[in-house]
């Protein structure tokens, strides 16, 4: 899927957000930028904890911040980490699909910024 200028701007916001990540254990800072349909952008970063299971990913933190402010109409999310490939983890995919199964996901794969619909990354989502 071709990336628009708006998609690349969103990716750059995710890159900038990653500087605020709290990743003292993995040293793997991640930033996410979630664009809402109204054009607003909500960012999130990963926040690690010494009790590793309490760590929260950047994508989920962005989604939770948006939901907490009453915003649930998501258009796209960009994820940045200083790695050749950094797609969202399975837990983040499941959380995002709760709100936007066709969410446009932008991330770096093999050093190139790419995008795909969330339904392609999580074809068999869990639903009740």
Where are these regions (language model features)?
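Short beta-strand scaffold segments in enzyme catalytic cores
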Residues: 27-36
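Short, surface-exposed loop/turn motifs that are enriched in glycine and acidic residues
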Residues: 3-4, 23, 51-52
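Short linear motifs in intrinsically disordered
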Residues: 20-26, 93-98
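Small-residue (primarily alanine) positions within well-ordered alpha-helices
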Residues: 14, 32-33, 62, 66
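Zn2+-dependent cytidine deaminase-like catalytic core
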Residues: 43-128
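Short, compositionally biased leader-like segments
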Residues: 1-12, 72
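Short, basic/aromatic recognition patches
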Residues: 8-23
């Amino acid at each position: 899927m071709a990336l628009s200028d708006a998609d690349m701007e969103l990716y750059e916001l995710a890159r900038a957000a990653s500087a605020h990540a709290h990743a003292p254990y993995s040293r793997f800072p991640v930033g996410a930028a979630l664009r809402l349909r109204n054009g607003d952008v909500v960012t999130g970063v990963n926040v690690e904890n010494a009790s590793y299971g309490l760590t929260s990913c950047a994508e989920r933190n962005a989604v939770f911040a948006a939901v907490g402010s009453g915003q649930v109409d998501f258009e796209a999310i960009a994820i940045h980490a200083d790695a050749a490939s950094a797609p969202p983890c399975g837990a983040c995919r499941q959380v995002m699909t709760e709100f936007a199964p066709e969410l446009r996901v932008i991330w770096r794969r093999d050093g190139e910024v790419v995008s795909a619909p969330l339904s392609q990354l999580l074809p068999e989502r869990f639903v009740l």
